[in-house]
Amino acid sequence: MTRDTNSNVGRRSVLKAASALGAFLGLGGVASATPGREPGPKKDEIIVGVSERVSSTEATVESKIPTNAEIVHTNETLGYVAVKFPSNAAEQARENFKRNVLQEDDIEYAEDNATYETLEVPNDPMYGQQYAPQQVNCEGAWAETYGDDDVVISVVDQGIQYDHENLAENMDGSVSDYGYDFVDDDGDPYPVSAGENHGTHVGGIAAGGTNNDTGHAGISNCSMLSARALGDGGGGSLSDIADAIQWSADQGADIINMSLGGGGFSETLDNACQYAYDEGTLLVAAAGNDHGGSVSYPAAYDSVMAVSSLDEGETLSSFSNVGPEIELAAPGGNVLSAVNWDDYDSLSGTSMASPVAAGVAGLALSAHPGLSNDELRDHLHDTAVDIGLSDDEQGYGRVDAELAVTTDPDNGDDDDDDDDDEDDPGDGECGDETNTATADGELSGGWGGNPSDTYSYELSTDNPCHATVTLDGPSSGATFDLFLTLDGRTPTTSDYDRRSYNWGADEEIEVDLDGDEELGILVDRYDGSGSYTLTIEELGS
């Protein structure tokens, strides 16, 4: 089975079991950390990812590490290990290991166990009155639903004060202590100090108690899980964050909020986000606070919905990152929410905008419980309000709770739309126009062999809507893999947008098109040799 095909499973809290059993089973393929492993950032570690064809992740890597290094963490589900070098090891030693291990069979990637940070911007001492729920029209949504407690939002962040006066009633009691602590590797995600406020504040925005005569109004009354992956200082390791994402999906979270970023592109984090998306979870993340810089990861991954920040006047926040990955905008400047201990404060950052969008997603899913994650994502796009910013600043627009709840996802918000747009060629069924291209090649190993071929393909139909890339290789004795990019860059085995890699030499990738893509294709030899035929079928409407 390929990993690039989204399953779009509708999550309806599939693991609502007894607390202790739910917590035990929820850790699935996440191995315990080595005793004594320091929490938080892990600059001395290298993460090594392996092919999903191997039977044991740890055994595959163990024989390939230097004698002064050790495997300190394993995640069999995501297929990676963390290899720790001594703190006094030369930087070049780690770089040499990353380069050399990539030459080994079944090794997919090697990268630093980077540090990600909370995306909070320090606020002024003057705090404005709460405005975020009003800006996204929560009142109209609340007339229909305050949020269903069967809808679960997992907050991957610092710990949440789960007994906070305005959060306790919305914590998901199906899991012991309402979550898991990946920083300290224990079952209690409670914050360790009063200053560890970020997770409590973010959680209070998405699912703080509403209409309960207490404190502030959160966006929704959906249930909430705390996946503590960032430590007291606001930083967290790549492996802890990836494990927290996987765990959240395995717990049945419908929505994962990630108000964090800053570590750059990571195969491990990309795989974790794609894993959760394939499990049916909608992932929402903060765009970043680099004052107009490019969208940070994990928000920039295809599987994640990136959210920019607005101020009270619906202008783009000065700190907000922008770019083509932005899908929604939401209020993020001076947002009032809960903080430790049973207190309240206003904070600013795309960290605050992301949980607003996550909370609206929770309201929408409460009103339309049959939606898959893909359908929910599209519905939030369709019901967003254009506030006059550029696409790179607002994406589809400012998220709107009332429209997301009251608009029928099947019919849209205007019954006359179909009649008005009958002549729009983009509204035809996908497949009215077809273009097919083929190429033949041969791959072989050894000295002077040809281990891979690359191709580029420009869309040619009037309104491209779908493409299928098919690789037909030798019937036996060879294993070929197929990689695809959507922006014209040349794909590699570590830089791609879609991939298909099975045993054997026949692969296929299907992708929906918006019309502005240019396909880059890599046919790569994993084992064996032989001839192949590459076929691209483009459909237009």
From Swiss-Prot:
Enzyme Commission number(s) from the entry: 3.4.21.-
Keywords, ordered alphabetically: Hydrolase, Protease, Secreted, Serine protease, Signal, Zymogen
Peptidase S8 domain ranges (all copies): 130-405
Active site, per annotation: 157 (charge relay system), 198 (charge relay system), 351 (charge relay system)
Regulation: Dependent on high salt concentrations for activity and stability. Strongly inhibited by the serine protease inhibitors diisopropyl fluorophosphate (DFP), phenylmethyl sulfonylfluoride (PMSF) and chymostatin. Also inhibited by denaturing agents such as SDS, urea, and HCl guanidinium. Activated by thiol-containing reducing agents such as dithiotreitol (DTT) and 2-mercaptoethanol.
Compositionally biased intervals (Acidic residues): 410-432
Propeptide: 34-121
Pfam families, alphabetized: Peptidase_S8
Domain of life: Archaea
Induction conditions: Expressed and secreted during the transition to the stationary growth phase. Is probably up-regulated in response to factors (metabolite and/or regulatory molecule) occurring in high-density cultures.
Protein name: Halolysin-like extracellular serine protease Nep
Species, as recorded: Natrialba magadii
